[in-house]
């Protein structure tokens, strides 16, 4: 006998609330995706190929990297492995959210919002769970993930079909577009930041700084993740040890 489908708890956030809460992400995604569409066509990809990247890969800054590598003649495997190394942090997003979610999850809905779990969507979901985890719902998550994905695809369509070189005379604007995603991600993280996490954040920053100074950006990402996670584990064990005595 099949288990009953989990129902949203009374007072939980709705799909439309998720769409509404995605507005800051949508506003930042459209211009960056627009720049990606322009850049991809400038590198020789067709408008349809550019849109395909955004629909299927949906990897933000990694899309700029993979299109540049493919245009330069790199093999598909090398480009794919490079992007996987850059985005390895996404492996931790699901477990991190799951540890805070108190509701039962429905596999079909989870698969939908998991596809759209970008840095910014993850940060927004974390902030929601930190403020009030009882209001979090999969319908809300689908709303924010779907709206964000749609805005990314929409921005790519506009950029890819508007013609190459539209921002060529405005380098400052093009540089600012590339900074919008990191700035948005940091704003969400600061909104959910708690003082007790200071040590973990410091360790992650030190690890990332050492990685980027001594090696490369992918190594810096891995080093930051490892240092932050190890510090969190040590801190949790140290704080929990007295209770076991």
Curated annotation (Swiss-Prot):
One Pfam family cited in the UniProt record for this chain: AzlC
What is the protein's membrane topology class?
Multi-pass membrane protein
Locate the transmembrane regions by residue number.
Answer: 25-45, 64-84, 110-130, 141-161, 173-193, 206-226
Gene Ontology CC terms: plasma membrane; transmembrane transporter complex
Record's family?
Belongs to the AzlC family.
| Alphabetically ordered keywords of this record | Cell inner membrane, Cell membrane, Membrane, Transmembrane, Transmembrane helix, Transport
Name the domain of life this protein comes from: Bacteria
Cytoplasmic membrane side: 1-24, 85-109, 162-172, 227-245
Keyword Cell cycle attached: no
Q: Is Repeat tagged as a keyword?
A: no
Enumerate the subcellular locations listed in this protein's record, separating them with semicolons.
Answer: Cell inner membrane
Please give the biological process terms from Gene Ontology that the record holds.
Answer: L-valine transmembrane transport
- What's this protein's name? Inner membrane protein YgaZ
Per the UniProt topology annotation, the Periplasmic ranges are: 46-63, 131-140, 194-205
């Amino acid at each position: 006998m099949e288990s009953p489908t989990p129902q949203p708890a009374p007072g939980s956030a709705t799909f439309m609330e998720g769409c509404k809460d995605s507005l800051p992400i949508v506003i930042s995604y459209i211009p960056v995706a627009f720049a990606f569409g322009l850049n991809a066509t400038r590198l020789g990809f067709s408008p349809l190929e550019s849109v395909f990247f955004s629909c299927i890969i949906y990897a933000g800054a990694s899309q700029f990297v993979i299109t540049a590598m493919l245009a330069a003649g790199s093999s598909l495997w090398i480009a794919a492995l490079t992007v996987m190394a850059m985005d390895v942090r996404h492996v931790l997003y699901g477990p991190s959210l799951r540890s805070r979610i108190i509701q039962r999850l429905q596999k079909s809905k989870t698969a939908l919002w998991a596809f759209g779990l970008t840095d910014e969507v993850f940060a927004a979901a974390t902030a929601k769970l930190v403020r009030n985890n009882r209001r979090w719902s999969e319908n809300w998550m689908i709303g924010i993930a779907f709206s964000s994905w749609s805005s990314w695809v929409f921005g790519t369509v506009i950029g890819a079909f508007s013609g190459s070189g539209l921002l060529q005379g405005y380098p400052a604007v093009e540089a600012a577009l590339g900074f919008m995603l990191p700035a948005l991600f940091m704003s969400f993280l600061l909104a959910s930041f708690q003082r007790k996490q200071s040590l973990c954040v410091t360790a992650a920053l030190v690890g990332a700084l050492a990685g980027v100074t001594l090696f490369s950006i992918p190594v810096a990402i891995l080093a930051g993740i490892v240092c932050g996670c190890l510090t969190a584990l040590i801190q949790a064990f140290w704080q929990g040890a007295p209770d076991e005595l």
